[in-house]
Structures are given as structure tokens and as C-alpha cells.
Amino acid sequence: MAALRDTYNDPVHIAVIGGTGLRELPHFTQVASLNITTPWGPPSSPITILHHTCSTSGKVVPVAFLSRHGLHHEYAPHEVPARANIAALRSIGVRSIVAFSAVGSLQEAIKPRDFVVPDQVIDRTKGVRPWTFFEGGAVAHVGFADPFDEQMAKVVRACGHSLEGDGVVLHDRGTLICMEGPQFSTRAESNLYRSWGGSIINMSCIPEAKLAREAEIAYQMICMSTDYDCWHSEAADVTVDMVMANMKMNSVNARNFIGAVLDELTKDEHAALVQAKHLEGTCKFGLSTSPGYLSAEALTKLSWLFPGYFSNN
């Protein structure tokens, strides 16, 4: 196999962030591998540029793929360089992200190997992870009432037909608990989250979703249930082996689902969504720091992320 290019000149509007069990997308043509350094450091993996041929139109569309936990799963949840990941993707043109995550189920109806398209998040991280691009002399407040992009969610939900297997269900909505980790929940915590109305639990959504919103990127997570966490009286408590076994058994479904979503997103009717036209300017107009008072460091970093957005003039 020829070496991949280390540059790619065309804008790439769509990205997939792979998590546990989804570290690559087979049947896509790899054309480039980009090593990008951002003001927040390097991302967790090189960004692979894939050419995706839409099954309906035959159109070839570039898609960026980034491995959240690194090529060899070397980043713990609290160590993932989320700011660098989101910044690097935006720098190559990405304006829409489909993120994948294994999750524990907090509800009987969400069985292992079911899929969930969450619409809400409860943040149970502990402030260890940097969660904003605005600091050190720049303050902005961006809305996060609906943490996922509803337009993206509609596209994802419409692709549930790609799922196969007896009893595999796509749940259209759900509240995702994002915990700190890397240890799994205590039984008391698991039951507490259930009492709050939590549907599923992971360690990856925050700050990824918050940073995507600040970066004006349409973001939707696709979750695959692998276990019942530790609340279920008749099911074994979650272990890494359990998670990976269910991921392996359902890997074809996961990849087919992602492929179906990419097929749909590459249609011309979704061009405005893919470029997140509905989010343009939300960050710029969320800035609270008075003009002329951005610190030099903050201005340098923000100008890298948003060329032409901010100035001290």
C-alpha cells in the first residue's frame, strides 16, 4: 500500500470521532493522514482523510476520522486532548461531527447492543478536563440548553434501518450521564443516575460536545449500549471484557450505521447542515470581553481557531 499523503487541500466538512470499539472505518478509501499541531497541542491521533462514495449518488466526499482515545487506546477519558481534537478538525474545514461511544445502560428497555441517539446530557465530570476555548483573558458564554444538534439527530435517527439482528433497537432520545471515570460507577451512583432520569452513561461526551458547540460545529453522538452498568439485580456488573465483547459482536452494525449516516449527510439537501450554517456566528456573538481587552495569548489562540473573528481594534 502506497504511503498516505500528509496534506489535503480541499475542505473537509464532515468528521467521525471514533471511541471504544470504533477506531477505524473499513471500506472507505484512505487518502491522507494529517498531523496537525494546534495552540492546545496535538490531537489524540492523526486525522485520517477518507473518501466516501455515497451509495445513492455516487458522489465522492472527503470525511475526517479521528480516534478519540488514540491509535492504541492510550488516552484515559480525562486525558483526551479534546480542545486539540476539536480545534484540529475545525482547522481543516469540519463543521459537522458524528461521534461514536460505547455506553452503559441505565434503563431496562435499553438492552446491550441497542443504539441510542441522546438528546440531553448531565455533566458529572469533575473539572479535571479543560472544557472551554475561552479563558486566560477571553470570556464567552455559548448556549448549551440542547447539547446535541437536533438537525443532525434527525438525520441519524432516519438511518436506523441499517441496523440488523434480532431485537436490536434504535432509541430516538435519551439523557446521557457523562461521568469522570476512569473507574466505573458505584452501585449507589448508578441508582442515583437512574432516579434522575438518566438513560445511558459514558465518560466521553463532555467536554467534547461543549467544545464542538463553542467551535460552531454541529455535533451528534451515537451511543451503543454494551452493559447495564451495575444497577441491574439480574445482570453482571460492567467489566472491560463485557464492553469489548458486545462491541465486537455488534461491530458490523456500528460501522453500517455510521456508513448510512454518512451516505445521508453527503446528499445535497443536507449541504447547509453539513456546513453548520445555522451555528455561524453563535460563538462570535457570545463573547463578553470588551473589544480591545482580549489578552494577547487569548487573541492568538482564538484567531487560530476562528480566523478573522476577533480583534482588539
Curated annotation (Swiss-Prot):
Main subcellular location: cytoplasm
Domain of life: Eukaryota
Gene Ontology CC annotations of this record: cytosol; nucleus
UniProt xrefs under Gene3D superfamilies: Nucleoside phosphorylase domain
Assembly information from the UniProt record: Homotrimer.
Family note: Belongs to the PNP/MTAP phosphorylase family. MTAP subfamily.
NCBIfam families linked: MTAP
Protein name: S-methyl-5'-thioadenosine phosphorylase
Organism: Ajellomyces capsulatus (strain G186AR / H82 / ATCC MYA-2454 / RMSCC 2432) (Darling's disease fungus)
